[in-house]
Regions:
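Histidine-centered divalent metal-coordination motifs
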Residues: 32, 63-64
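Short, hydrophobic-biased segments on the C-terminal half of alpha helices
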Residues: 36, 65-66
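Alpha-helical residues within the helix-turn-helix
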Residues: 52, 63, 69-70
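Amphipathic alpha-helical dimerization/coiled-coil segments
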Residues: 1-19, 41, 89-120
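N-terminal helix-turn-helix DNA-binding core of bacterial DNA-binding proteins
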Residues: 18-57, 79-91
Length: 120
């Protein structure tokens, strides 16, 4: 058991920390992040729609969707002859908003204080 990093009063079992690490690993790939961002914006979408929108080969999109699906971040639904994908993890939108906001704030700080970028 470990104390949660943002709310120190909450104890999180190691199994949940392991699951969080697996999910963050899924989010560490730029292509998967692009797929998730597009799904959050326009879901549900087919592999072909994702492939065309992202300029990525359909087999590559399918492989990434399979990983995201196995990680329970996206789900699939059959509509006639096609399969459409959507996000199923409710926290994804909040997590993406948090990260984007933090990156924008950091970029703004660095543009005001460019010497901080070099200090790195």
């Amino acid at each position: 058991m470990r104390k949660c990093c943002y709310a120190r009063r909450v104890t999180v079992p190691d199994s949940l920390i392991d699951e969080a690490a697996r999910r963050f690993a899924l989010l560490s790939d730029p292509t998967r992040l692009r797929i998730l961002a597009l799904l959050l914006e326009r879901e549900p979408m087919t592999v072909t729609e994702l492939s065309d929108s992202l300029g990525i080969a359909a087999p590559n999109v399918s492989q990434h969707l399979a990983r995201l699906s196995a990680g329970r971040l996206v789900g699939r639904e059959k509509q006639g002859r096609s399969v459409r994908y959507r996000t199923i993890e409710p926290s994804l939108h909040s997590l993406c908003e948090l990260m984007c906001s933090a990156l924008v704030e950091q970029a703004e700080r660095l543009s005001v204080h460019p010497s901080r970028a070099r200090a790195g």
